[in-house]
Amino acid sequence: MATKKTPVTDDAALPSFEDGVDLDQAIGDLRGVLKTDAEGSLSDFGDFGDFGSTDEVSTDNDLSAFGGGAADFAMDDFAAAPQVAGVKAPLGSGLSENMEMIMDIPIDVQIVLGTSRMLVSGLMSLEEGATIALDRKIGEPVEIMVNGRRIARGEITVLEDDDTRFGVKLIEVLSTRKA
């Protein structure tokens, strides 16, 4: 069976520029790059020499042939926080912003009362009012699952403020680390 292909519309294929300012800026940037490339004003990388040479490997740290700014680069502190427009970002600020985004992601938590195994014929013969026996007894802890992984165990309770609803009281939180 052939797959159904969705036609690409002009609106989906092109980025939308709400006003002409963004489009003019993008075109201007592209022209600048093309002009620089056409003039050949990009820095040379220097002569790499003979790679097949049997000469002894040089241990000098003169990297000026690789764009000229390498000496400054070699002395940079890699542990320093990144700078944007002259302002230093506090260490770990990106991590905390990402954590805030992650903490806002909704997840489904499943409470597993028990399981049952039956033949297809038994499943097909189920009718309204039938009782399915589970593999757990009354009072045994239930499993709390997230994404198919057991994260805790708990006891079924009735909510204090709403006696028409059930809840789960955690009795054991399992390690989240993979072995």
Swiss-Prot record:
- Annotated GO MF terms: cytoskeletal motor activity
The answer to whether UniProt assigns keyword Membrane to this entry is yes
DNA repair listed as a keyword: no
**UniProt xrefs under InterPro entries:** FliN, FliN-like_C, FliN/MopA/SpaO, FliN_T3SS_HrcQb, SpoA-like_sf
The way it spans or sits in the membrane comes to: Peripheral membrane protein
Q: A GO CC term? A: bacterial-type flagellum basal body
Membership in a protein family: Belongs to the FliN/MopA/SpaO family.
Protein name (Swiss-Prot/TrEMBL) = Flagellar motor switch protein FliN
